[in-house]
Structures are given as structure tokens and as C-alpha cells.
């Protein structure tokens, strides 16, 4: 019988090769920059192999109560990892969960890096179980779920079936567009609180729509994405270029009703991952449109982040930039990975600040590697510790979370490609 591995919080800093050689070695305090991508990708391969065993164990040992609740809600079978629970157990989610596409995306990244068909087959397996989500019109998270999984798969294989699934996903997402307000509706829940909420996270789902226009030649998707990005730029941001988490719209008049948070400290605070989504989202929008307004927005968000008095020296943000207990507040490694990945891309578009953007991205990657990495063959196969989902409700606080790992690997691949070829796209 397989023994369940508990979460271990000791962080080893040795390269993989040294870990495998055994005793008698002295721990390194930093990773040589030339080896940091290779080391982390070797580590990721080992950890994700470990994750397959953890997934099998979690599925086999799901409690009757959990199974009954899942079936009652019509959530379908458990598919992919989301996070480690406080007791060290692995939390798996069904395809309906907004995080279900990140794990298969990681597998596609490993296939891209290694060209090993083992990772391709595993990626196909964990991607295909999400296909039914292409028709799920009850969520804005089609980009997270479908583009991170099927999108990476199509990019690497040109599988026509994946293309059709992605186009249907884009059609489904476009049904949530509200023309009067000019935005894509986010949540359908909390209808007693919001009429038509839009969260900053939704910027990340626009890449699917841009892709759909390029593949289908139908400009509808492009126009929806640009409208959403422009409206978000107008209404989500404060004068200092920090952003709100939730903006509530009147779908008849298009007027803003409320400016709130749901996962940050307070309505007027700067939730760290929200700022990261904004930086990444507008950088990506500039890539897809070449509209200068989006590049300027990304640059302003970056400036806000890296001149903030509460940005830590290691550049791994606290969960909210206005959290009252800083420096004794939980960090959010997931925000750091999103920021790093975005900075590598942003460095391609702003020659004046390119060196600074890349240097800060490199610092984030180095600090995550040396101080935030999990323990080899443990921690349920996750890569990074110390992410924070929703601090105020004590959900996913200071634990490994799958999207931190996804954007960490993406950042590593971008760093590798940038340093080898000088360009990303």
C-alpha cells in the first residue's frame, strides 16, 4: 500500500543532481544563473512524476462524504490537482473548477522542454478529461481551463481536434459578453451582492479570444477582447495604477455600480495577485493587438508594483500590499510567478526598461528557487510553497497551489528562450 506523504516545509537548495548523489554534500545558498532553468526543469519532472502517484492515491481515498457532495452538485469525477490542504493532503478538483487546466498545462510545458513523449501522453490524458468544459457557459474561466490545457496542446501538436475544442470554448466564452457595459461577465454567484461582476482575473481569459480570431478569421472575438480590456482599463484602476478586484456593472446602462474586493484585504487595498493578473493581462493584450494604450497600462502597473513601499526585498509579494501585519503576513508565490512571466514578455516591448524588467524577473525566479521550492519527492508533487488563495476566509493560505507552479514553469521557459534566441514570439 502506498504511504501518504505529508507536507514538508523544509526547503532544500541543492540542485537535483546533488540531491540524487546522497550524503556528504554541502547545501548551496544560490543557483548559478546559467543552470537555474535546467535545475528547475529537472526538479519539475521529478515532482510531477511524484504527483501522478499522489493523484492516484487521492482518487482512491476520496471520502464518501466528498464523493456524495460532488455527485450532488453534478461536478463530475476528480481530475487534476489544485493545492495542498493544511493537513498535507492533496486537493483534487473536477473539470468544472477554474484551476483544472493548469496541471495539464504544466505537462505540456515539460513536453515542450524535453520533447519526451512520456510527457506528451500524460499531457493528453490530463487535457482530454476537460473537453466537456467547452460548453460550460456558466463561467468566464475558459482561458484558464481550456487555453492553458488545450491551447498549449494545440500550439505544440497542431491537433485539429484541439483546435475545434478551443474554438467552441471561445464561442462559449463570448456568450458572456455584455454589449451595453462592454465587458465579459465574470461570476454568476453572489447575485444578492452584484448584478454583473467583472474581476481583474478575467484579463487572463482574453488570450483565448485573440487566438480564436486568428484561427477563425472572425473579428468578433478580437473586438470583444479589446472592448473588455479597454473597459477594464477605464474602470478597474485607481490613479496610482493599482486595481480593484471586482467591478459591478449595470448591464442595462453600462454604469459602474460598485468597486469591491473579494479576495483582497479591503475594497481600497491592492490584492497582490490581482495586480499580477493586470500586469500579465495588459502585456499579453499589447502582444495581440499592438495597441500602445495596453503597453502603457502594463508599464504603469509594473511601476506601481516595483516602487511600492511594501514590495519585499526578495520581490515575492505579501498577499495584499496593504495587509496590516507586514512583514508578518503570508506571501503569495503565485503572484510572484505571474509577475515574473509577464516581465520576461514585457522586456521585449519596452527597450528603455527592458534590462530592468528582465533583471527583476530573474531575481524572482532565483529567490523562488532558493527559498520557496518544495522538497524533492514530497509536498504532493508541487513545485513551490507559500502561495495564498483567499486570506480573509482562510482558504489556501501559505500552501502550494497549482497555478503558482504553472506560471513558474512558464517563466522558466520564457527565460530560457529569451536568453537563447533573444525573442519569445
Predicted feature residues:
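Bacterial N-terminal signal peptides that target proteins for export
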Residues: 2-16
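C-terminal motif of bacterial Sec signal peptides marking the signal peptidase cleavage site
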Residues: 26-27
Amino acid at each position: 500500500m502506498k504511504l501518504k506523504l505529508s507536507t514538508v516545509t523544509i526547503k532544500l537548495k541543492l540542485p537535483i543532481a546533488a540531491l540524487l548523489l546522497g550524503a556528504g554534500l554541502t547545501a548551496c545558498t544560490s543557483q548559478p544563473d546559467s543552470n537555474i532553468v535546467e535545475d528547475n526543469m529537472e526538479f519539475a519532472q521529478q515532482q510531477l512524476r511524484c504527483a501522478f502517484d499522489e493523484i492516484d492515491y487521492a482518487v482512491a481515498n476520496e471520502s464518501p462524504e466528498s464523493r456524495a457532495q460532488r455527485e450532488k452538485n453534478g461536478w463530475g469525477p476528480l481530475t487534476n490537482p489544485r493545492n495542498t490542504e493544511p493537513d498535507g493532503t492533496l486537493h483534487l478538483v473536477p473539470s468544472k473548477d477554474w484551476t483544472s487546466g493548469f496541471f495539464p498545462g504544466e505537462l505540456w510545458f515539460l513536453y515542450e522542454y524535453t520533447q519526451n513523449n512520456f510527457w506528451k501522453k500524460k499531457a493528453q490524458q490530463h487535457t482530454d478529461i476537460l473537453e466537456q468544459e467547452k460548453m460550460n457557459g456558466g463561467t468566464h474561466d475558459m482561458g484558464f481551463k481550456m487555453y492553458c490545457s488545450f491551447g498549449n496542446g494545440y500550439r505544440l501538436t497542431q491537433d485539429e481536434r484541439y483546435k475545434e475544442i478551443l474554438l467552441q470554448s471561445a464561442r462559449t466564452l463570448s456568450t458572456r459578453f455584455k454589449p451595453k457595459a462592454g465587458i465579459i461577465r465574470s461570476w454568476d454567484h453572489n447575485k444578492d451582492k452584484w448584478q454583473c461582476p467583472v474581476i481583474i482575473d478575467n484579463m487572463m481569459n482574453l488570450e483565448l479570444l485573440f487566438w480564436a480570431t486568428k484561427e477563425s478569421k472572425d473579428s468578433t472575438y478580437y473586438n470583444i477582447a479589446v472592448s473588455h480590456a479597454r473597459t477594464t482599463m477605464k474602470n478597474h484602476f485607481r490613479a496610482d495604477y493599482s486595481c480593484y478586484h471586482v467591478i459591478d456593472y449595470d448591464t442595462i446602462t453600462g454604469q459602474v455600480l460598485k468597486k469591491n474586493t473579494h479576495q483582497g484585504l479591503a475594497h481600497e487595498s491592492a490584492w497582490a495577485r490581482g495586480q499580477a493578473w493586470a500586469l500579465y493581462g495588459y502585456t499579453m493584450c499589447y502582444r495581440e493587438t499592438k495597441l500602445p494604450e495596453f503597453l502603457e497600462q502594463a508599464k504603469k502597473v509594473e511601476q506601481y508594483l516595483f516602487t511600492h513601499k511594501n514590495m519585499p526585498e526578495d520581490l515575492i509579494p505579501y498577499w495584499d500590499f496593504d495587509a496590516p501585519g507586514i512583514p508578518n503576513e503570508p506571501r503569495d508565490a503565485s503572484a510572484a510567478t505571474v509577475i515574473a512571466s509577464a516581465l520576461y514578455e514585457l522586456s521585449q516591448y519596452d527597450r528603455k526598461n527592458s534590462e530592468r524588467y528582465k533583471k527583476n524577473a530573474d531575481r524572482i525566479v532565483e529567490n523562488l528557487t532558493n527559498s520557496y521550492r518544495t522538497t524533492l519527492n514530497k509536498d504532493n508533487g508541487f513545485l513551490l510553497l507559500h502561495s495564498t488563495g483567499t486570506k480573509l476566509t482562510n482558504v489556501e493560505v501559505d500552501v502550494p497551489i497549482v497555478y503558482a507552479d504553472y506560471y513558474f514553469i512558464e517563466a522558466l521557459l520564457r527565460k530560457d528562450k529569451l536568453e537563447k534566441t533573444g525573442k519569445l514570439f
